Amino acid sequence: MTGTRILELFGPAPEPPSELGRYRILSPTAGIRVSPLQLGALSIGDAWSTDLGSMDKDSAMELLDAYAAAGGNFIDTANAYQNEQSEMWIGEWMASRGNRDKMVIATKFGTDYRAHELGKGLAVNYSGNHKRSLHMSVRDSLQKLRTSWIDILYLHTWDYTTSIPELMDSLHHLVQRGDVLYLGICNTPAWVVSAANTYAQQQGKTQFSVYQGRWNPLRRELERDILPMARHFGMAVTVYDALGSGKFQSRDMLARRKDQGEGLRAIYGGQQTALEEAMSKALGVVAAQHGIESVTAVALAYLLAKAPYVFPIIGGRKIQHLHDNIEALSLRLSQEEIEYLESVGDFDPGFPYDMAGVDPADTGIATPIVAQAAPMAFVQRSKAIGYAESSKGSQMFG
């Protein structure tokens, strides 16, 4: 009996209910294990239903249950989402399910999260990057989430009004106290993050281990400086707007939404642009190559193939959409497929990359200043888990 127990203890875990439960290391500087797709909780709540659609508490609990049942453990929220309902409902869900220790919760500070109750202009120190805002936000998030710690705390947006030493010293204090485990930053220029992490490393403080930003096949600005910066500092990248604000949809999907009385989210505009329609068609072509219909799965697979330590955030309000998105984890996109999707848009890295070139570790091609000296060969950087060396249908992308 004892031997059996020992074998069970050290034996492998069973296969997960879906690929969502095949966990990954968050980043080289954050060893916590997380699901490859993060559940975005922007829609958890009904306070912003006019702009984001309606989701009552029962539906929210069902969505959270479905995500967890599929093996998901990684949830993204913020202090202000849905006028604080998002954090409160997640906290209520974890308390009722008794699963706090199983979940990895990321939340954010920096926005004015109390104006909805106190009034505009009457909650000035509830927002900003400064120590007082941070103190109150973490105090309140812990209470709303019904937890004693936050797994990942993001600075929501850089506001240029707080010094890097004040920010990093204050964040490090929370880590030392055990209120926060890992640090992240969103919507911030690469030079600021670089300066902050350099300060942290030099002063023996906790650095940012994850960056959150906008990225999809039509919005590739993150690749210019933020992605190389994240790689340099050992940071993960969590991605919002991965599905083009919900506009990467086939004509059939849009027709079904219309038949069901649903439109695109009002806050993002009610119609696809010509470029969004073209991208949706291209995503459909790649989906067909893989024998599936879901263009959203391909859009997510694109990000998962681009670089290691990338975690798309999936939002939405329907369980069926969740399962469609999980399909992305079974896809592997080739370089030909990636380039085919990127050919729809127009991304120019600009100066100084048009002069200096890009890292040969990514391309295998020497930069002009290196090539002028001698022929060179380069060790290639590791590819993402979602990357495939070749595609059976690659000839159609030529």
Curated annotation (Swiss-Prot):
Gene Ontology BP term (one): terpenoid biosynthetic process
Active site per UniProt: 81 (proton donor)
Q: Which GO terms describe its molecular function?
A: oxidoreductase activity
Q: Give the pathway annotation.
A: Secondary metabolite biosynthesis; terpenoid biosynthesis
Q: What class of enzyme is it?
A: oxidoreductase
Q: Which domain of life is it from?
A: Eukaryota
> In a knockout, what does one observe?
Impairs the synthesis of austinol and dehydroaustinol and accumulates the intermediate compounds preaustinoid A4, preaustinoid A5 and austinoneol A11.
- What keywords sit in the KW lines? NADP, Oxidoreductase
- Gene3D superfamilies from the UniProt entry: NADP-dependent oxidoreductase domain (3.20.20.100)
Residue sites binding substrate per the record: 156
**Membrane-crossing residues?**
none
Enzyme Commission code: 1.1.1.-
Which residues are noted in the entry as NADP(+)-binding? 76, 186-187, 212, 241-251, 317-325
Instruction: Please give the family membership noted in the entry.
Output: Belongs to the aldo/keto reductase family. Aldo/keto reductase 2 subfamily.
UniProt function note = Aldo-keto reductase; part of the gene cluster B that mediates the biosynthesis of austinol and dehydroaustinol, two fungal meroterpenoids. The first step of the pathway is the synthesis of 3,5-dimethylorsellinic acid by the polyketide synthase ausA. 3,5-dimethylorsellinic acid is then prenylated by the polyprenyl transferase ausN. Further epoxidation by the FAD-dependent monooxygenase ausM and cyclization by the probable terpene cyclase ausL lead to the formation of protoaustinoid A.
Q: How does it assemble?
A: Homodimer.
Task: Quote the PANTHER family the UniProt record gives.
Answer: ARYL-ALCOHOL DEHYDROGENASE AAD10-RELATED, NADH-SPECIFIC METHYLGLYOXAL REDUCTASE-RELATED
Additional detail: In A.calidoustus, the austinoid gene cluster lies on a contiguous DNA region, while clusters from E.nidulans and P.brasilianum are split in their respective genomes. Genetic rearrangements provoked variability among the clusters and E.nidulans produces the least number of austionoid derivatives with the end products austinol and dehydroaustinol, while P.brasilianum can produce until acetoxydehydroaustin, and A.calidoustus produces the highest number of identified derivatives.
Q: What name goes with this protein?
A: Aldo-keto reductase ausK
